[in-house]
Amino acid sequence: MQNILITGSSGFIGSNILLNIFNKHNIYITSRSKISIKLKELKVIHYKNHLDLNKKLKKIKIDIIIHCGTHYVKNHNVSDINKLTLANIEFGVILLENLKSMGVKKFINFSTVWQNYNGKQDIAYNLYSAFKLSYSKILDYYIGKYSFIRFYNLFISDTYGENDNRSKIINLIKQNIRNKKKIRIVSK
């Protein structure tokens, strides 16, 4: 069994990964607050701030990090900037700074296709995707620094899956079929 650290385990991607691999590995998750996930053998790394997280990461051995943690806002306000910075840059850099001390062999990062908007390299769609683009550039530095670790940077377009109740196109189509309404789908 491998020791796997999953960040963003309360989000859609992270929670689904957690539930799918939980019985096959020793799973660690990070959390700043109480969690609703009730899995008996789950190891929760509670932390108050990023300095506290840094200390706690130095004390554990991890084979694989699956980094799904993020703060997402499509249209930001000035009040979102601190959360975007802490979640999308600082938190991830603390993980990267501890790769060697934790003994990490693989680092899997979830990014967004929006950081290459309309197929244009390094042109962000919004501030969120600009932060994800910045983190990808930071990740490149660590890829060069730690050649003994396998890095994967996954560019996700969208997600949908079992128990997904968000207002996604599939759910909207199903809802309109049930209500016998037409749905107009338009592309630009």
State what each model feature region is:
Residues 83-91, 126, 130-133:
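Glycine-rich NAD(P)-binding loop of the Rossmann-fold in SDR/ketoreductase-type enzymes
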